[in-house]
Amino acid sequence: MRIVFAGTPEPAVPSLERLIRSPRHDVVAVITRPDAVAGRGRKVVRSPIGALADSHGIEVLTPERPTEPEFLARLTDLAPDCAPVVAYGALLPQKVLDIPAHGWVNLHFSLLPAWRGAAPVQAAIGAGDDMTGASAFRLEAGMDTGPVYGVVTERIRDTDTAGDLLGRLADSGAALLESVLDGIEDGAITAVPQPAEGVSHAAKVTVEAARIRWDRPAAVVDRHVRSVTPGPGAWTTIGDVRLKVGPVTPTDERLEPGEISVTKSGFLIGTSTAAVRLDRVQPQGKKQMAALDWARGARLDAEVRAQ
């Protein structure tokens, strides 16, 4: 099939790589978000999908808005049979959805209808789910509401960060997406409507939402930290210092919520149940470092609390 692929960040790369290698499909163009300015040097940076397409000589479309007449005209001229989508980063209007002959197939990193929305992997870890997966579904106007072609499942490990889990789902989801496109071409696959039960929503994780609440149980704090790692990153304030917090480990020691203990065994902070031991921290504007080294160097007042 003639394929136009839409995607932007690194988790979309395995899917595009598989489709480029596929002997059955021809990726004639990709759609990705416009180049961004990033870093201290304020350099213009191509999205991972745009960079991959460039390396293979594939046409790259970067509309500011998918309603632009020039974009609509070019997409129509490309005459795609199908358009797979993986984390593109913008909603597509109906006039765009209507262009491919077989529609758009979205790869979403949850077992729909669970965790519809922008941050399904983060939500699944934060909620303490044992299992998640990826769903390939036909894109429609609603938010992740279209009928599902197929799914793959993935167990959530006790130490998984969002980055760990998303990496595995990106790989297994890529294989699913290729299989679904093969089935669509063969006329051998049918999309099944999502059930009305089991719907949940995963809003985008803001920096404020990533702040650690020390009045919650240790297990919840641990899941929260892992769910927002690597980005936007869990954080807290201690005195007048804002710290990004890396992995934490629940312990058997008891401290009051936010209470701090610095001993040979580690840098501990209390929760509503047991204390957790901090592994790595990153003071704002500085490099990541061992949490115990930071705490010893900070010479914390006995009354200071994590907020």
UniProtKB/Swiss-Prot annotation:
An annotated Gene Ontology molecular function: methionyl-tRNA formyltransferase activity
Pfam families assigned: Formyl_trans_C, Formyl_trans_N
Catalytic activity, reaction form: L-methionyl-tRNA(fMet) + (6R)-10-formyltetrahydrofolate = N-formyl-L-methionyl-tRNA(fMet) + (6S)-5,6,7,8-tetrahydrofolate + H(+)
Gene3D superfamilies in UniProt: 3.40.50.12230
InterPro entries found in the cross-reference section: Fmt, Formyl_trans_C, Formyl_transf_N, Formyl_transf_N_sf, Formyl_transferase-like_C_sf, Met-tRNA-FMT_C, Met-tRNA-FMT_N
Binding site for (6S)-5,6,7,8-tetrahydrofolate: 110-113
EC number(s) reported in the record: 2.1.2.9
UniProt keyword terms in alphabetical order: Protein biosynthesis, Transferase
Similarity comment: Belongs to the Fmt family.
PANTHER family per the UniProt record, alphabetical: METHIONYL-TRNA FORMYLTRANSFERASE (PTHR11138), METHIONYL-TRNA FORMYLTRANSFERASE, MITOCHONDRIAL (PTHR11138:SF5)
HAMAP family xref list: Formyl_trans
Role according to the record: Attaches a formyl group to the free amino group of methionyl-tRNA(fMet). The formyl group appears to play a dual role in the initiator identity of N-formylmethionyl-tRNA by promoting its recognition by IF2 and preventing the misappropriation of this tRNA by the elongation apparatus.
Stated name of the protein: Methionyl-tRNA formyltransferase
Gene name linked to the record: fmt
